[in-house]
Protein backbone atom coordinates (compact mmCIF):
# COMPACT_ATOMS: atom_id res chain seq x y z
CA UNK A 1 0.00 0.00 0.00
CA UNK A 2 1.43 3.44 -0.89
CA UNK A 3 2.69 5.55 1.99
CA UNK A 4 0.16 8.33 1.30
CA UNK A 5 -2.72 5.85 1.69
CA UNK A 6 -1.27 4.46 4.90
CA UNK A 7 -0.77 7.97 6.22
CA UNK A 8 -4.34 8.88 5.33
CA UNK A 9 -5.58 5.85 7.22
CA UNK A 10 -3.50 6.73 10.28
CA UNK A 11 -4.80 10.28 10.32
CA UNK A 12 -8.33 8.95 9.88
CA UNK A 13 -7.77 6.84 12.97
CA UNK A 14 -6.66 9.94 14.89
CA UNK A 15 -9.85 11.66 13.75
CA UNK A 16 -11.87 8.88 15.38
CA UNK A 17 -10.58 9.94 18.77
CA UNK A 18 -9.70 13.64 18.53
CA UNK A 19 -11.69 16.53 17.03
CA UNK A 20 -9.99 17.16 13.70
CA UNK A 21 -7.50 14.44 14.55
CA UNK A 22 -5.50 16.69 16.87
CA UNK A 23 -5.31 18.03 20.41
CA UNK A 24 -4.34 21.54 19.29
CA UNK A 25 -5.83 22.93 16.06
CA UNK A 26 -2.71 24.17 14.28
CA UNK A 27 -1.35 20.61 14.22
CA UNK A 28 -3.97 19.72 11.61
CA UNK A 29 -1.87 21.71 9.07
CA UNK A 30 -5.02 23.00 7.34
CA UNK A 31 -3.51 26.40 6.36
CA UNK A 32 -0.85 24.70 4.22
CA UNK A 33 -2.95 21.89 2.78
CA UNK A 34 -0.92 18.88 3.87
CA UNK A 35 -1.81 15.71 5.70
CA UNK A 36 -0.41 16.25 9.21
CA UNK A 37 2.50 13.99 10.11
CA UNK A 38 2.01 11.66 13.07
CA UNK A 39 5.23 11.46 15.03
CA UNK A 40 6.78 8.19 16.12
CA UNK A 41 10.01 9.51 17.63
CA UNK A 42 12.34 12.50 17.64
CA UNK A 43 16.04 13.11 18.23
CA UNK A 44 18.12 16.28 18.20
CA UNK A 45 16.93 18.26 15.14
CA UNK A 46 14.73 15.64 13.45
CA UNK A 47 11.54 13.71 13.96
CA UNK A 48 10.40 10.49 12.34
CA UNK A 49 6.77 9.98 11.39
CA UNK A 50 4.78 6.80 11.89
CA UNK A 51 5.87 5.49 8.47
CA UNK A 52 9.56 6.05 8.93
CA UNK A 53 9.99 9.31 7.01
CA UNK A 54 12.50 11.68 8.57
CA UNK A 55 11.85 15.42 8.80
CA UNK A 56 14.26 18.16 9.81
CA UNK A 57 12.26 19.98 12.46
CA UNK A 58 12.00 23.78 12.50
CA UNK A 59 8.90 23.86 14.68
CA UNK A 60 10.57 22.42 17.75
CA UNK A 61 7.37 22.09 19.76
CA UNK A 62 6.52 25.68 18.83
CA UNK A 63 9.80 27.11 20.05
CA UNK A 64 10.07 25.13 23.27
CA UNK A 65 12.98 22.96 22.16
CA UNK A 66 15.87 25.38 21.85
CA UNK A 67 18.07 22.43 22.91
CA UNK A 68 16.48 20.07 20.41
CA UNK A 69 14.69 16.78 20.96
CA UNK A 70 15.91 14.46 23.71
CA UNK A 71 18.93 16.40 24.96
CA UNK A 72 21.00 13.96 27.07
CA UNK A 73 21.06 16.24 30.11
CA UNK A 74 17.30 16.69 30.02
CA UNK A 75 16.68 12.96 29.57
CA UNK A 76 18.91 12.21 32.55
CA UNK A 77 17.06 14.74 34.68
CA UNK A 78 13.69 13.25 33.71
CA UNK A 79 14.79 9.73 34.69
CA UNK A 80 16.40 10.80 37.96
CA UNK A 81 13.47 12.97 38.99
CA UNK A 82 10.84 10.39 38.04
CA UNK A 83 12.57 7.84 40.25
CA UNK A 84 11.80 10.11 43.22
CA UNK A 85 8.10 10.45 42.43
CA UNK A 86 6.02 11.85 39.60
CA UNK A 87 3.74 14.29 41.42
CA UNK A 88 3.42 15.41 45.03
CA UNK A 89 0.69 18.01 45.24
CA UNK A 90 3.03 19.71 47.71
CA UNK A 91 5.82 22.24 47.41
CA UNK A 92 8.99 20.45 46.34
CA UNK A 93 12.70 21.13 46.49
CA UNK A 94 12.70 21.16 42.69
CA UNK A 95 10.31 24.15 42.62
CA UNK A 96 12.52 26.15 44.95
CA UNK A 97 15.61 25.23 42.96
CA UNK A 98 14.07 26.30 39.63
CA UNK A 99 12.84 29.57 41.13
CA UNK A 100 16.33 30.37 42.43
CA UNK A 101 17.85 29.59 39.03
CA UNK A 102 15.20 31.66 37.24
CA UNK A 103 15.79 34.76 39.36
CA UNK A 104 19.54 34.35 39.02
CA UNK A 105 19.18 34.33 35.23
CA UNK A 106 16.83 37.31 35.13
CA UNK A 107 18.74 39.28 37.79
CA UNK A 108 15.49 40.19 39.54
CA UNK A 109 15.34 41.22 43.18
CA UNK A 110 12.27 41.52 45.41
CA UNK A 111 10.23 39.46 42.93
CA UNK A 112 8.17 36.33 43.41
CA UNK A 113 7.00 33.73 40.91
CA UNK A 114 4.06 31.36 40.54
CA UNK A 115 4.60 28.26 38.39
CA UNK A 116 1.72 26.85 36.34
CA UNK A 117 1.38 24.29 33.55
CA UNK A 118 0.58 26.37 30.45
CA UNK A 119 1.03 29.81 28.97
CA UNK A 120 -2.74 30.28 28.97
CA UNK A 121 -2.88 29.69 32.72
CA UNK A 122 -0.06 32.15 33.26
CA UNK A 123 -1.46 35.01 31.16
CA UNK A 124 -5.01 34.46 32.39
CA UNK A 125 -3.91 34.68 36.01
CA UNK A 126 -1.61 37.62 35.32
CA UNK A 127 -4.58 39.59 33.97
CA UNK A 128 -6.72 38.58 36.95
CA UNK A 129 -3.92 39.65 39.28
CA UNK A 130 -3.52 43.02 37.54
CA UNK A 131 -7.24 43.77 37.73
CA UNK A 132 -7.40 42.92 41.42
CA UNK A 133 -4.23 44.85 42.23
CA UNK A 134 -5.39 48.03 40.50
CA UNK A 135 -9.12 47.71 41.15
CA UNK A 136 -9.72 48.53 37.49
CA UNK A 137 -11.60 46.67 34.78
CA UNK A 138 -10.15 47.41 31.35
CA UNK A 139 -7.46 45.36 29.65
CA UNK A 140 -5.70 46.48 26.46
CA UNK A 141 -4.08 44.03 24.07
CA UNK A 142 -2.83 44.35 20.50
CA UNK A 143 -4.36 42.91 17.36
CA UNK A 144 -2.46 39.87 16.14
CA UNK A 145 -0.83 39.09 19.48
CA UNK A 146 -1.90 35.79 21.02
CA UNK A 147 -1.89 35.30 24.77
CA UNK A 148 -3.67 31.98 25.19
CA UNK A 149 -7.21 30.73 24.83
CA UNK A 150 -8.84 31.94 28.05
CA UNK A 151 -12.08 33.79 27.34
CA UNK A 152 -10.74 37.07 28.65
CA UNK A 153 -7.86 36.88 26.18
CA UNK A 154 -9.87 35.76 23.14
CA UNK A 155 -12.77 38.19 23.33
CA UNK A 156 -12.31 41.86 22.48
CA UNK A 157 -13.26 45.01 20.62
CA UNK A 158 -11.27 45.96 17.55
CA UNK A 159 -10.84 49.71 17.49
CA UNK A 160 -10.51 51.24 14.05
CA UNK A 161 -8.25 54.28 13.70
CA UNK A 162 -11.13 56.40 12.38
CA UNK A 163 -13.35 55.55 15.35
CA UNK A 164 -10.89 56.32 18.10
CA UNK A 165 -13.12 58.94 19.72
CA UNK A 166 -15.93 56.41 20.19
CA UNK A 167 -13.90 54.57 22.80
CA UNK A 168 -15.53 56.15 25.91
CA UNK A 169 -18.99 55.20 24.61
CA UNK A 170 -17.90 51.61 23.91
CA UNK A 171 -16.38 51.27 27.35
CA UNK A 172 -19.49 52.57 29.08
CA UNK A 173 -21.71 50.26 27.06
CA UNK A 174 -19.73 47.07 27.72
CA UNK A 175 -18.22 47.77 31.14
CA UNK A 176 -19.13 44.79 33.33
CA UNK A 177 -18.25 46.25 36.72
CA UNK A 178 -16.60 42.94 37.65
CA UNK A 179 -12.86 43.34 38.33
CA UNK A 180 -12.32 39.67 37.42
CA UNK A 181 -14.01 40.05 34.00
CA UNK A 182 -12.26 43.01 32.40
CA UNK A 183 -13.37 44.69 29.22
CA UNK A 184 -10.91 43.80 26.50
CA UNK A 185 -9.88 46.58 24.10
CA UNK A 186 -7.82 45.57 21.08
CA UNK A 187 -5.60 48.16 19.41
CA UNK A 188 -3.39 47.97 16.30
CA UNK A 189 0.10 46.63 16.94
CA UNK A 190 2.96 49.05 16.28
CA UNK A 191 0.84 52.25 16.39
CA UNK A 192 1.95 54.18 19.45
CA UNK A 193 -0.13 57.23 18.51
CA UNK A 194 -3.41 55.31 18.67
CA UNK A 195 -2.35 53.75 21.95
CA UNK A 196 -1.57 57.17 23.37
CA UNK A 197 -4.93 58.60 22.27
CA UNK A 198 -6.83 55.68 23.79
CA UNK A 199 -4.95 56.00 27.06
CA UNK A 200 -5.68 59.72 27.19
CA UNK A 201 -9.37 58.86 27.08
CA UNK A 202 -9.60 55.76 29.28
CA UNK A 203 -6.16 55.37 30.85
CA UNK A 204 -7.34 55.92 34.41
CA UNK A 205 -9.66 52.92 34.01
CA UNK A 206 -7.09 50.57 32.47
CA UNK A 207 -5.94 47.77 34.74
CA UNK A 208 -3.32 46.34 32.43
CA UNK A 209 -1.77 46.33 28.99
CA UNK A 210 -0.60 42.94 27.75
CA UNK A 211 1.82 42.61 24.83
CA UNK A 212 4.40 40.45 23.13
CA UNK A 213 7.73 42.33 23.03
CA UNK A 214 8.24 40.79 19.59
CA UNK A 215 5.03 39.62 17.96
CA UNK A 216 5.35 35.93 17.15
CA UNK A 217 1.82 34.63 16.73
CA UNK A 218 1.09 36.39 13.46
CA UNK A 219 4.51 35.34 12.26
CA UNK A 220 7.59 37.24 13.37
CA UNK A 221 6.54 40.90 13.31
CA UNK A 222 9.17 43.18 14.76
CA UNK A 223 8.16 46.15 16.92
CA UNK A 224 8.87 49.56 15.49
CA UNK A 225 11.65 51.42 17.32
CA UNK A 226 10.23 52.86 20.52
CA UNK A 227 6.85 51.12 20.32
CA UNK A 228 7.25 48.74 23.27
CA UNK A 229 9.13 51.33 25.29
CA UNK A 230 6.36 53.84 24.57
CA UNK A 231 3.64 51.42 25.64
CA UNK A 232 5.37 50.86 28.97
CA UNK A 233 6.06 54.56 29.59
CA UNK A 234 2.51 55.67 28.78
CA UNK A 235 0.98 52.84 30.80
CA UNK A 236 2.94 53.84 33.88
CA UNK A 237 1.85 57.43 33.46
CA UNK A 238 -1.69 56.20 34.11
CA UNK A 239 -0.68 53.60 36.75
CA UNK A 240 -1.79 50.77 34.45
CA UNK A 241 0.22 47.59 34.92
CA UNK A 242 2.13 46.16 31.96
CA UNK A 243 2.18 42.42 31.29
CA UNK A 244 4.98 41.31 28.98
CA UNK A 245 4.18 37.95 27.42
CA UNK A 246 7.50 36.16 26.92
CA UNK A 247 6.04 32.70 26.60
CA UNK A 248 7.76 32.38 23.21
CA UNK A 249 10.54 35.00 23.35
CA UNK A 250 11.72 34.19 26.88
CA UNK A 251 15.29 32.78 26.84
CA UNK A 252 15.22 32.62 23.04
CA UNK A 253 17.72 35.45 22.39
CA UNK A 254 19.35 35.84 25.77
CA UNK A 255 19.35 34.53 29.31
CA UNK A 256 17.33 37.56 30.45
CA UNK A 257 14.74 37.12 27.73
CA UNK A 258 14.14 40.17 25.55
CA UNK A 259 15.68 42.25 28.32
CA UNK A 260 18.96 40.90 26.94
CA UNK A 261 18.44 42.93 23.76
CA UNK A 262 15.83 45.57 24.66
CA UNK A 263 15.70 48.16 27.43
CA UNK A 264 12.24 47.23 28.72
CA UNK A 265 10.91 46.54 32.20
CA UNK A 266 7.33 45.36 32.61
CA UNK A 267 5.38 45.07 35.86
CA UNK A 268 4.42 41.43 35.28
CA UNK A 269 6.28 39.02 33.00
CA UNK A 270 5.08 35.66 31.70
CA UNK A 271 7.37 32.82 30.63
CA UNK A 272 6.86 29.36 29.16
CA UNK A 273 8.10 27.03 26.41
CA UNK A 274 11.92 27.16 26.81
CA UNK A 275 11.43 27.53 30.57
CA UNK A 276 9.97 24.02 30.56
CA UNK A 277 12.47 22.49 28.17
CA UNK A 278 9.69 20.51 26.49
CA UNK A 279 7.68 19.89 29.65
CA UNK A 280 4.40 21.67 30.52
CA UNK A 281 5.75 24.64 32.47
CA UNK A 282 4.90 28.32 32.48
CA UNK A 283 5.32 31.07 35.04
CA UNK A 284 4.33 34.61 35.84
CA UNK A 285 6.35 36.84 38.10
CA UNK A 286 6.33 40.36 39.45
CA UNK A 287 7.46 42.43 42.42
CA UNK A 288 6.30 40.89 45.68
CA UNK A 289 3.92 43.83 46.27
CA UNK A 290 1.92 42.58 43.27
CA UNK A 291 2.41 38.84 43.71
CA UNK A 292 1.36 38.89 47.36
CA UNK A 293 -2.20 39.64 46.21
CA UNK A 294 -2.40 35.94 45.28
CA UNK A 295 -3.88 33.42 47.67
CA UNK A 296 -2.94 32.39 50.30
CA UNK A 297 -1.61 35.87 51.19
CA UNK A 298 -4.18 37.87 49.22
CA UNK A 299 -7.57 37.33 47.64
CA UNK A 300 -6.70 36.52 44.00
CA UNK A 301 -7.43 32.89 43.25
CA UNK A 302 -5.13 30.57 41.33
CA UNK A 303 -4.63 26.87 41.82
CA UNK A 304 -3.47 23.77 39.97
CA UNK A 305 -2.83 20.19 41.00
CA UNK A 306 0.11 19.88 38.61
CA UNK A 307 1.48 23.40 39.05
CA UNK A 308 5.15 23.03 39.94
CA UNK A 309 5.26 19.35 38.98
CA UNK A 310 8.61 18.08 40.31
CA UNK A 311 9.74 16.43 37.07
CA UNK A 312 8.83 19.50 35.02
CA UNK A 313 10.63 21.75 37.51
CA UNK A 314 13.80 19.67 37.27
CA UNK A 315 13.70 19.80 33.48
CA UNK A 316 13.11 23.55 33.58
CA UNK A 317 16.23 24.04 35.65
CA UNK A 318 18.23 21.87 33.27
CA UNK A 319 16.95 23.88 30.30
CA UNK A 320 18.04 27.17 31.87
CA UNK A 321 21.42 25.74 32.85
CA UNK A 322 22.02 24.71 29.24
CA UNK A 323 21.12 28.25 28.15
CA UNK A 324 23.68 29.62 30.61
CA UNK A 325 26.56 27.70 29.10
CA UNK A 326 29.43 29.79 27.75
CA UNK A 327 28.68 31.42 24.37
CA UNK A 328 25.34 29.61 24.02
CA UNK A 329 23.55 32.62 22.54
CA UNK A 330 26.43 33.96 20.39
CA UNK A 331 26.79 30.49 18.86
CA UNK A 332 23.06 30.30 18.17
CA UNK A 333 23.09 33.75 16.56
CA UNK A 334 26.08 32.84 14.39
CA UNK A 335 24.27 29.67 13.35
CA UNK A 336 21.22 31.73 12.37
CA UNK A 337 23.22 34.32 10.44
CA UNK A 338 25.08 31.73 8.38
CA UNK A 339 21.88 29.80 7.73
CA UNK A 340 19.73 32.71 6.55
CA UNK A 341 22.30 34.76 4.60
CA UNK A 342 22.32 32.64 1.39
CA UNK A 343 18.51 32.44 1.38
CA UNK A 344 18.16 36.20 1.78
CA UNK A 345 20.70 36.70 -1.01
CA UNK A 346 18.67 34.55 -3.42
CA UNK A 347 15.43 36.36 -2.53
CA UNK A 348 17.10 39.71 -3.19
CA UNK A 349 18.90 38.62 -6.37
CA UNK A 350 15.81 36.99 -7.89
CA UNK A 351 13.53 39.83 -6.84
CA UNK A 352 11.04 37.47 -5.24
CA UNK A 353 8.17 39.25 -3.44
CA UNK A 354 9.10 37.54 -0.17
CA UNK A 355 10.25 38.95 3.14
CA UNK A 356 12.28 36.64 5.35
CA UNK A 357 11.91 38.17 8.80
CA UNK A 358 13.85 36.89 11.76
CA UNK A 359 14.46 37.78 15.38
CA UNK A 360 17.47 35.79 16.49
CA UNK A 361 16.63 32.14 15.82
CA UNK A 362 12.91 32.77 15.17
CA UNK A 363 11.85 33.36 11.56
CA UNK A 364 8.94 33.68 9.15
CA UNK A 365 8.50 33.84 5.38
CA UNK A 366 6.00 36.52 4.38
CA UNK A 367 4.95 36.53 0.74
CA UNK A 368 5.02 40.30 0.27
CA UNK A 369 7.64 42.83 -0.81
CA UNK A 370 8.26 44.39 2.60
CA UNK A 371 8.13 43.01 6.15
CA UNK A 372 4.69 43.49 7.71
CA UNK A 373 4.32 45.71 10.76
CA UNK A 374 0.83 44.73 11.90
CA UNK A 375 -1.90 42.14 11.44
CA UNK A 376 -3.56 43.91 8.52
CA UNK A 377 -0.32 43.78 6.54
CA UNK A 378 0.19 40.13 7.48
CA UNK A 379 -3.30 39.34 6.21
CA UNK A 380 -2.46 41.05 2.91
CA UNK A 381 0.34 38.54 2.24
CA UNK A 382 -0.15 35.94 -0.46
CA UNK A 383 -1.03 32.98 1.74
CA UNK A 384 -1.86 30.82 -1.27
CA UNK A 385 1.70 31.19 -2.55
CA UNK A 386 3.00 30.41 0.93
CA UNK A 387 1.03 27.17 0.80
CA UNK A 388 2.62 26.24 -2.54
CA UNK A 389 6.06 27.01 -1.11
CA UNK A 390 5.36 25.06 2.06
CA UNK A 391 4.27 21.94 0.20
CA UNK A 392 7.48 21.97 -1.85
CA UNK A 393 9.49 22.24 1.38
CA UNK A 394 7.51 19.56 3.19
CA UNK A 395 7.81 17.10 0.30
CA UNK A 396 11.60 17.26 0.70
CA UNK A 397 11.56 16.40 4.39
CA UNK A 398 11.75 19.83 6.01
CA UNK A 399 9.09 20.73 8.55
CA UNK A 400 8.41 24.42 9.10
CA UNK A 401 5.61 25.59 11.37
CA UNK A 402 2.53 24.79 9.24
CA UNK A 403 0.84 28.17 8.81
CA UNK A 404 1.73 31.47 7.12
CA UNK A 405 1.02 33.34 10.36
CA UNK A 406 3.29 31.30 12.61
CA UNK A 407 6.99 31.44 13.40
CA UNK A 408 9.54 28.71 12.84
CA UNK A 409 12.60 28.13 15.02
CA UNK A 410 16.23 27.11 14.88
CA UNK A 411 17.65 25.06 17.74
CA UNK A 412 21.17 24.97 19.11
CA UNK A 413 21.56 21.39 17.85
CA UNK A 414 20.63 21.80 14.20
CA UNK A 415 23.55 20.14 12.44
CA UNK A 416 25.59 21.84 9.73
CA UNK A 417 24.64 19.05 7.33
CA UNK A 418 20.92 19.44 7.96
CA UNK A 419 21.11 23.22 7.77
CA UNK A 420 22.97 23.04 4.45
CA UNK A 421 20.37 20.63 3.11
CA UNK A 422 17.55 22.88 4.32
CA UNK A 423 19.13 25.93 2.69
CA UNK A 424 19.04 24.13 -0.64
CA UNK A 425 15.47 22.95 -0.05
CA UNK A 426 14.22 26.43 0.82
CA UNK A 427 15.95 28.03 -2.16
CA UNK A 428 14.77 25.26 -4.50
CA UNK A 429 11.22 25.62 -3.19
CA UNK A 430 11.22 29.39 -3.67
CA UNK A 431 12.42 28.94 -7.25
CA UNK A 432 9.71 26.35 -7.95
CA UNK A 433 7.03 28.48 -6.33
CA UNK A 434 7.80 31.42 -8.58
CA UNK A 435 8.29 29.28 -11.68
CA UNK A 436 12.02 29.84 -11.92
CA UNK A 437 12.73 26.11 -12.17
Curated annotation (Swiss-Prot):
Keyword field: Cytoplasm, Isomerase, Porphyrin biosynthesis, Pyridoxal phosphate
Co-factor(s): pyridoxal 5'-phosphate
Record PTM N6-(pyridoxal phosphate)lysine, positions in chain: 273
Biological or metabolic pathway of the protein: Porphyrin-containing compound metabolism; protoporphyrin-IX biosynthesis; 5-aminolevulinate from L-glutamyl-tRNA(Glu): step 2/2
Assigned GO CC terms: cytoplasm
Molecular-function annotations in GO: glutamate-1-semialdehyde 2,1-aminomutase activity; pyridoxal phosphate binding; transaminase activity
Superkingdom assignment: Bacteria
Catalytic activity: (S)-4-amino-5-oxopentanoate = 5-aminolevulinate
Compartments it resides in: Cytoplasm
E.C. no: 5.4.3.8
Xref: Pfam families: Aminotran_3
Top-level class of the enzyme under EC nomenclature: isomerase
GO annotation terms (biological process): protoporphyrinogen IX biosynthetic process
Assembly and binders: Homodimer.
Family of this protein: Belongs to the class-III pyridoxal-phosphate-dependent aminotransferase family. HemL subfamily.
Protein's recorded name: Glutamate-1-semialdehyde 2,1-aminomutase
Amino acid sequence: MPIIEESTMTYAEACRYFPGGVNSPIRACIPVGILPPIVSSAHRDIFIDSFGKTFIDFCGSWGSLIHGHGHPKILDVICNSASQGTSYGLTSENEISLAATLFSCLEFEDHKVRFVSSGTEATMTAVRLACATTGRSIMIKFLGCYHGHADVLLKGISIDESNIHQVPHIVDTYFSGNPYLPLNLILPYNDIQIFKEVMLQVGERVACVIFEPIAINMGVVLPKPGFIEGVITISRRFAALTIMDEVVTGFRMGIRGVRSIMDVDSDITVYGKILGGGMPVAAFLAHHRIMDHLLPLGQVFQAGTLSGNPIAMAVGKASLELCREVDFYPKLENLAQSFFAPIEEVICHQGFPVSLVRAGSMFSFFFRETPPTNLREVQECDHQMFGVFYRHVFAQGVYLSPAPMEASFLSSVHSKENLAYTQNVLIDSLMKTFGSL
